[in-house]
């Protein structure tokens, strides 16, 4: 929408999809879920799946994004773009053609496994100025800006039958939905991270054929502190149809809240001790990691940001 030389804008996207895959076939002659139970004499999985079964694992996903802002028309030397954006992606997992054998005859054959949700909210302010300098072939472009970004990751628990340790567990019947146990309430929850960034980018045409550039970006993360990265670039036109270019830069990528705090575990019952055990992947930032690190010779380190150094060169034809 035009506003006297500037414009307001908004755009949005929405996408959805679904998919299903299967796990290996469960042989009724060798799978423990097909055993007989003294606790629940009515349980007979061979009546439900006489030829065995292949658990089916699926997902429904929804993705939504909305961006709006206010920007100049770029006709003058100074231009700007102020914007805000929100995005959300959610995956709902489900299983069917499966069983929680530890629940016996009370077990359903389809399960809601739980949900994973990632959302991001960003605010951006970008500015550019074209300066005329006598010693340059053309105007120098000076760009700068700032960004605030908040990420949130959420795990939603599945239905009780998808992760339950049922009454038949002491007899050796496996717990949780066969193939992929659901997310338990202990695994559910949300975590977030906020970052603030500022950047400066300069590009100068030294001659009609030779252009150089330099950029620096500073970013501060709520979970990691701050980091500074830079880039140097050059481009030389050998002819109207051929150019040489080269770039040297550093990079930084912080782990997301999902990578930092999410856990994926399942529980079972030791038929000898009748103790419940938990196995799976724990967060290196969580309390379990702190306890395990107290053991001799064990030191679980928290996730660190990825850092990189890059050199590129090439031809443009």
Annotate each language-model stretch with its function.
Residues 1, 66-72, 125-129, 198-204, ...:
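Residues on the lipid-exposed face of transmembrane beta-strands in outer-membrane beta-barrel proteins
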Residues 1-23, 27-51, 55-75:
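Transmembrane beta-barrel wall of Gram-negative outer-membrane proteins
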Residues 5-8, 77-80, 135-140, 209-212, ...:
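Repeated loop/turn-to-beta-strand initiation elements of outer-membrane beta-barrel proteins
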Residues 10-16, 82-88, 142-150, 198, ...:
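Transmembrane beta-barrel strands of outer-membrane/channel proteins
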Residues 24-43, 96-106, 158-168, 230-233, ...:
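Flexible, surface-exposed loop regions and adjacent strand-edge segments
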Residues 45-47, 53-67, 73-75, 86, ...:
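Outer-membrane beta-barrel transmembrane domain signature of Gram-negative proteins
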Residues 88-92, 97, 146, 150-155, ...:
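Surface-exposed extracellular loop regions of Gram-negative outer-membrane beta-barrel proteins
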Residues 192, 196, 219-229, 307-309:
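Solvent-exposed loop/turn segments connecting transmembrane beta-strands
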């Amino acid at each position: 929408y035009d506003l006297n030389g500037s414009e307001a804008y908004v755009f949005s996207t929405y996408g959805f999809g679904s998919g299903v895959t299967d796990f290996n076939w469960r042989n009724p002659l060798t799978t423990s879920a097909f055993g007989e139970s003294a606790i629940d004499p009515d349980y007979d999985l061979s009546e439900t799946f006489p030829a065995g079964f292949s658990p089916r694992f699926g997902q429904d996903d929804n993705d939504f994004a909305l961006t709006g802002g206010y920007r100049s028309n770029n006709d003058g030397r100074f231009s700007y773009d102020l914007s805000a954006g929100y995005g959300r992606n959610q995956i709902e997992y489900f299983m069917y053609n499966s069983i929680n054998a530890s629940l016996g005859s009370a077990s359903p054959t389809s399960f809601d496994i739980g949900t994973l949700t990632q959302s991001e909210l960003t605010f951006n302010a970008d500015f550019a100025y074209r300066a005329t300098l006598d010693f340059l072939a053309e105007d120098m472009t000076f760009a700068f800006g700032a960004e605030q970004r908040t990420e949130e990751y959420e795990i939603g628990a599945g239905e009780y039958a998808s992760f339950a340790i049922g009454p038949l567990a002491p007899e050796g019947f496996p717990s949780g939905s066969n193939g992929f146990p659901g997310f338990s309430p202990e695994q559910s929850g949300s975590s977030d991270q906020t970052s603030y960034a500022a950047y400066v980018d300069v590009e100068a045409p030294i001659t009609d054929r030779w252009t150089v550039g330099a950029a620096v970006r500073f970013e501060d993360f709520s979970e990691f502190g701050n980091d500074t990265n830079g880039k140097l670039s050059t481009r030389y036109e050998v002819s109207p149809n051929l150019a040489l270019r080269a770039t040297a830069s550093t990079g930084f990528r912080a782990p997301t809240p999902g990578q930092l705090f999410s856990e994926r575990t399942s529980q079972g019952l030791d038929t000898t001790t009748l103790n419940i055990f938990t196995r799976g992947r724990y967060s290196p930032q969580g309390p379990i990691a702190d306890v395990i690190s107290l053991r001799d010779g064990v030191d679980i380190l928290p996730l660190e940001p990825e850092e990189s150094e890059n050199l590129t060169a090439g031809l443009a034809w």
